[in-house]
Swiss-Prot record:
Zinc fingers typed RING-type, residue spans: 837-884
PANTHER family in the record: VACUOLAR PROTEIN SORTING-ASSOCIATED PROTEIN (PTHR23323), VACUOLAR PROTEIN SORTING-ASSOCIATED PROTEIN 18 HOMOLOG (PTHR23323:SF26)
Subcellular location: Vacuole membrane
Each CHCR repeat, start to end: 602-756
GO MF: protein-macromolecule adaptor activity; ubiquitin protein ligase activity; zinc ion binding
Main subcellular localisation: membrane
InterPro entries: Clathrin_H-chain/VPS_repeat, Pep3_Vps18, Znf_RING
Name of protein: Vacuolar membrane protein pep3
TPR repeat boundaries on the chain: 314-345, 373-406, 408-436, 546-579
Length: 900
């Protein structure tokens, strides 16, 4: 597949069509190029009951005057609806229909006769005879409907005068519509007007007569209440052209109003000797072109009165029964067609619809339409052949023709070494990019090539991804090469000011290309180009536009520019990139790196563990300055991370630094509490590995491995710590005793300070001297224990004496209780029969009562009631009535329940 094939998007049908069209290029060797189908004469399928006398058409409204004194009105948009109108008898009393005129909308119809009678038909097809125009056979009419009920007509009379007729179009009084008539201009004897042309730009009037062409221009702008046509004739008159006495005008026509700058706005006048073209758009210095008869002898035969019309670029005329069309641009014949006539049929003339740009040929018995198919297409190729490229482009209304014109124009500019303009035009064509680029490369026009590729790139559609990508990378290479070339010039001090301006221009182009076409950039190819050309600034610019922070960071780390790398990290990079360069950044910029990490709360901390451990191994800083510890403390403390691997890592780093100071690890273990997040088995191994025995003991205690903890503490010769551990299991006396025995054995095995050892072991509260003596080594003399034994015996004696005293006190209390009980059995009180209750004064024996030693007696119910009244709810609710102290005391003398 060639490079040229890459420029056409196979998925774009539009581009394919343009490419196929572009294959047909204009060449002078092919005279039939683009001519086929431009003009065709087609007969209209209309049946006429009688012959046609004259015809007019405007705005697709076609009106024919028939020999039957009727008007046939055909709306070409609805040709099936034909309207017949009878002409007023007054109009045709003395003459025949001479001409028909239509206003630009086609709604008003003006009919004039050979006898000078005239009538006007309104949109409702009501005819009114214009009596004020009696005797004037009209040659031309200009219309002005001011939007109200006033219709102004500028009339050219065959009698040699210009008239302004004002009509009132009041539907209530259509019988009297003529308001006023004024004579604006009178022509000399033997001079009669043939046509009127209104210039819409300056309200001037161009009048064509049989002797000359005049232009009437108003001096001032028209007043609010002033008539429309009068000001032009009150101003200046300029004679544009006059004919000799031997030459008279026969007919005239003007072209449609131009749609573009290439179309001429032309008035054509046929005389007895020649055809004259007049440029209407330039009234001051008109461009008058003569078309001599010797170019086409056929024109010398005037068969009908109106045998000539103008299209946008062509002249159509009749010669006997043949229609000829000549291109006005190059004067060559473009079309001819013989009109088939019946034995008694005659051609009457040609007619033009200036509103819809349609053209008609009519005979006595038939109507033909001159169909114009894309006339500007042929005109464009003719302008191209003449080298008038600007007009050719104006007229190029198809992709095929425009491509042909652009290619021709560009090749012309290449021949004249106007390379930049040629590049701009080439970019608009479908010519292969490879072919055009080779032309500029062969001419060593690299700047022009860059311009061409720029223009071409901007012309591509969004769907042409591959082509755009190729051009973007090509442009990148050209710009990088240009920058290197400018650097070399600057190094040699050649034109420094010019070099600076060029560099700024290329840099602007480079930035624009990256910003506008970043989606089409091949990232790897662009990086390779920038690296190959050694353009660091542009390389980073590409990566920045592509938002490839990973590449930028990799670039700076490779070059050990850690400040720039940190700036990139702060702007945000992918997790993968951050992890990839974490070790390097931690090693060289630890605190700054951790500060940035702390602002990125969504990091995969687990993936950073290798970098943190590597940094910890390489760095030789105290715990307070260790960035790994700082970050892990932030993650576990602030972010609340509970991942065991993170806590294990922090534990490991603490352990590494605990050989000199174990307090940080101890604090961490204490902070973790009884349910730590680190692995305690791993923690013990790490503590043993780094000789952190106190920390290991703490972990063993947390695991309730008291025996191992005591043994480890004793291995560290820390009896105080071992004693602390032994006192922890308060409820398990057996275990506690075993632990203390282990401590005792260890301390006795050291054979130093037996007295101090025994004094220390006495604090255990679980080991007695006899037990300690059994634990003593055999080689220890009892003399060393005499003081301790004596102290122990004294302690036992004091204890025995204390127990004897307590027993004596208990015996005395028991004897006293027994004596009181015996006395209570022999005690009684005598009650009289009339004894009453001390509360209610009722007889005491009437119901159950209570008698107290003080000889007061109460009914049981009265006593309870009195108690309820005196006791508060708070006192009643103070204790349980079954097990409260007061109740329990009362139950001392009660027998045991049989239900128990």
């Amino acid at each position: 597949m060639s490079l040229a094939e890459d420029w056409i998007d196979p998925n774009s049908s539009e581009d394919s069509d343009i490419q196929e069209d572009a294959e047909l290029e204009y060449t002078a060797d092919n005279p039939e190029k683009e001519q086929r189908g431009v003009f065709s004469l087609e007969k209209v399928q209309l049946q006429f009951p009688v012959s046609i006398r004259c015809l007019a058409v405007e705005n697709n409204i076609l009106v024919m005057a028939l020999t039957s004194d009727k008007l046939m009105i055909v709306d070409l948009e609805r040709p099936e609806d034909i309207i017949d109108i009878e002409l007023p008898k007054k109009v045709l009393a003395l003459g025949l229909t001479y001409k028909i005129f239509l206003d630009p909308s086609g709604h008003y119809i003006f009919v004039t006769t050979t006898a000078g009678d005239n009538c006007l038909f309104t949109p409702s097809h009501q005819g009114r005879v214009l009596t004020k125009l009696k005797g004037h056979t009209v040659e031309a009419v200009q219309w002005n409907l001011n939007g109200g009920n006033i219709l102004e007509l500028l009339i050219a009379s065959k009698s040699g005068v210009l008239l302004e007729l004002v009509l009132t179009l009041d539907s209530a009084n259509l019988k009297r519509i003529e308001k006023s008539i004024n004579t604006l201009y009178s022509f000399p004897f033997m001079e009669s007007p043939m046509g009127i042309l209104k210039n819409i730009q300056d309200d001037s009037m161009t009048i064509v007569t049989n002797k000359r062409i005049l232009r009437f221009e108003p001096k001032t702008s028209r007043g609010k209440d002033q008539l429309y046509f009068s000001p032009a004739f009150q101003g200046s008159m300029k004679e544009i052209l006059s004919f000799s006495e031997e030459e008279t005008a026969q007919c005239f026509s003007y072209s449609p109003f131009p749609k573009n700058l290439a179309e001429p706005y032309t008035l054509a006048l046929k005389t007895s000797k020649r055809i004259i073209y007049l440029d209407i758009m330039n009234p001051v210095n008109p461009d008058i072109q003569d078309y001599e008869f010797n170019e086409s002898p056929k024109l010398s035969v005037p068969t009908v009165e109106m045998n000539m019309i103008l299209t946008s670029f062509h002249l159509a005329f009749l010669d006997l029964d043949t229609l000829y069309i000549v291109n006005r641009v190059n004067g060559k014949e473009s079309y001819q067609q013989r009109v088939n006539l019946s034995p008694h049929e005659e051609i009457l003339g040609l007619c033009c619809d200036h509103e819809k740009n349609t053209y008609w040929l009519y005979t006595t018995d038939s109507l033909h339409e001159l169909v114009v198919n894309n006339e500007t297409r042929e005109a464009s190729l003719v302008f191209l052949e003449k080298g008038d490229f600007e007009k050719a482009l104006e007229c190029a209304n198809t992709a095929k023709v425009r491509n042909t014109v652009l290619v021709g124009y560009a090749e012309f500019l290449m021949e004249h070494e106007e390379y930049e303009r040629a590049a701009t035009l080439y970019a608009e064509t479908l010519k292969s990019v490879e072919e055009v680029a080779l032309k500029f490369i062969e001419l060593n026009q690299k700047d022009v090539l860059r311009l061409y590729l720029w223009k071409k790139l901007r012309s591509y559609k969004s769907t042409m991804k591959i082509q755009k990508s190729l051009l973007v990378n090509w442009l990148l290479e050209l710009m990088l090469a240009k920058l290197n070339s400018l650097d070399e010039k600057e190094r040699l001090e050649l034109f420094p000011e010019n070099v600076m301006q060029q560099r700024q221009q290329v840099q602007r182009e480079f930035s624009t290309l990256l910003n506008q076409y970043k989606d089409e950039i091949n990232r790897e190819a662009a990086y390779n180009l920038a690296n190959n050309y050694g353009k660091e600034e542009q390389l980073l610019q590409i990566a920045t536009v592509m938002k490839d922070q990973s590449y930028i960071m990799h670039y700076w780390v490779q070059r050990e520019n850690y400040e720039k790398a940190l700036e990139t990290l702060n702007e945000g990079v992918s997790q993968e990139t951050l992890i990839q360069h974490a070790t390097a950044l931690l090693t060289h910029r630890p605190n700054e790196t951790v500060s940035i990490w702390e602002r990125q709360t969504d990091l995969d901390v687990h993936a950073l563990i290798p970098s943190l451990l590597s940094y910890n191994q390489r760095s030789h800083v105290p715990v307070e300055e260790n960035a790994a510890i700082r970050y892990l403390r932030y993650v576990t403390g602030v972010l609340g991370c509970v991942d065991p691997s993170i806590h294990n890592t922090l534990f490991c780093i603490y352990a590494c630094h605990s050989s000199s100071n174990e307090s940080y690890l101890m604090n961490y273990i204490e902070q973790q509490g009884n349910h730590p997040l680190y692995d305690m088995d791993l923690g013990i191994r790490l503590c043993l590995q780094f000789n952190c025995r106190r920390s290991a003991v703490k972990i063993l205690v947390l695991m309730k491995l008291y025996s191992q903890g005591v043994e480890l503490a004793l291995e560290a010769d820390d009896c105080e710590l071992a004693a602390t551990i032994a006192n922890i299991p308060e409820e398990d006396v057996v275990l506690k005793k075993t632990l203390w025995q282990t401590i005792a054995k260890y301390m006795f095995s050291k054979k130093s300070g037996i007295k101090e050892t025994l004094r220390f072991l006495e604090n255990s509260e679980v080991l007695q001297l006899p037990e300690l003596i059994r634990l003593l080594p055999e080689d220890i003399k009892l003399d060393d224990l005499s003081d301790n034994v004596c102290d122990e015996l004294d302690h036992c004696m004091k204890r025995i004496e204390q127990l004897d005293f307590e027993i004596g006190q208990a015996s005395e209390v028991a004897h006293e209780i027994q004596t009181n009980a015996e006395n209570m059995r022999n005690r009684y009180i005598v009650l009289e029969p009339n004894e009453s209750c001390w509360h209610c004064n009722q007889p005491l024996f009437s119901e159950p009562f209570v008698l107290f030693p003080c000889q007061h007696a109460f009914h049981r119910s009265c006593m309870l009631e009195k108690t309820y009244k005196l006791a508060s709810e708070k006192n009643i609710l103070k204790e349980c009535q079954l097990c409260g102290p007061s109740y329990a005391v009362r139950l001392i003398n009660e027998p045991f329940s049989t239900d128990f």
